[in-house]
Amino acid sequence: MQTLAERVGSLHGESLEQRYRTRGPAYFSRLLRGTHVLSSDELVRLVERAEEQGTLSDAEAQEIYDADLVVRGRRRPDGAPLYLVVEVSVGVGTHDVERAVRRAVLLTRTGVTALPVVAGNWVTPEATEAARAYQVWQLTDGRVIAPSADTSQG
C-alpha cells in the first residue's frame, strides 16, 4: 500500500508530465520548429510499421510506447525532421537518462532521427553527468541545457 507521500509524489509526476504534454510547443520550441507532441495513435502508427517489417520486436515497441512523450518537429539549424524522446520526472535521475537514451535509439530504428531528452524540476548531479556523457538534452523548469553545457558554474 502506498504512503501518502508516495501518492502525492506520483500525482506531482503525472501533473508535470501532463504540463509538458499540453505545453509541448512552448517547452520544446527552443530545440525544434513546428513542434507537435505525438498522440498515442500517431506513435503506434510510426512504431507498428517497424514492427511489421521486423525492425523492432514486440518488447522493443513496448519500450518506445512507455516513453513519457515523443515530440516531432524540425531541427532549428537546418530544418531537418527530428523526434525527441522525452522522459519526465520531478527529480531526474540516472535511470531517466538511461531510459531516454534507450528509447531514442529504438525509435531511430523506425527510420527517423531521434534525440533523448529528460525534463523535470531538478536533475541530480549524477544524472547531469550521465546526460553529458550520453548526449542527452535537459529541460529543467523550462530551461534548456545542451548535452555539452557546463553546468558546474553557478
Each model region followed by its residue ranges:
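Amphipathic, low-proline, heptad-repeat alpha-helices and/or compositionally biased low-complexity charged/polar-rich
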Residues: 1-31
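Active-site metal-binding core of divalent-cation-utilizing nuclease and nuclease-like domains
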Residues: 36-79
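Domain-level recognition of nuclease-like catalytic cores that cleave nucleotide substrates
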Residues: 109, 117-154
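Arginine/glycine-rich "motif VI" loop of SF2 helicases in the C-terminal RecA-like domain
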Residues: 105-113
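Conserved catalytic cores of phosphodiester-cleaving nucleases, focusing on short active-site segments
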Residues: 24, 65-73, 77-96, 100-105
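N-terminal capping/linker segments that flank leucine-rich repeat
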Residues: 35-45, 137-138, 151-154
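A structural signal for isolated positions on well-ordered beta-strands in alpha/beta enzyme cores
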Residues: 84, 115-117
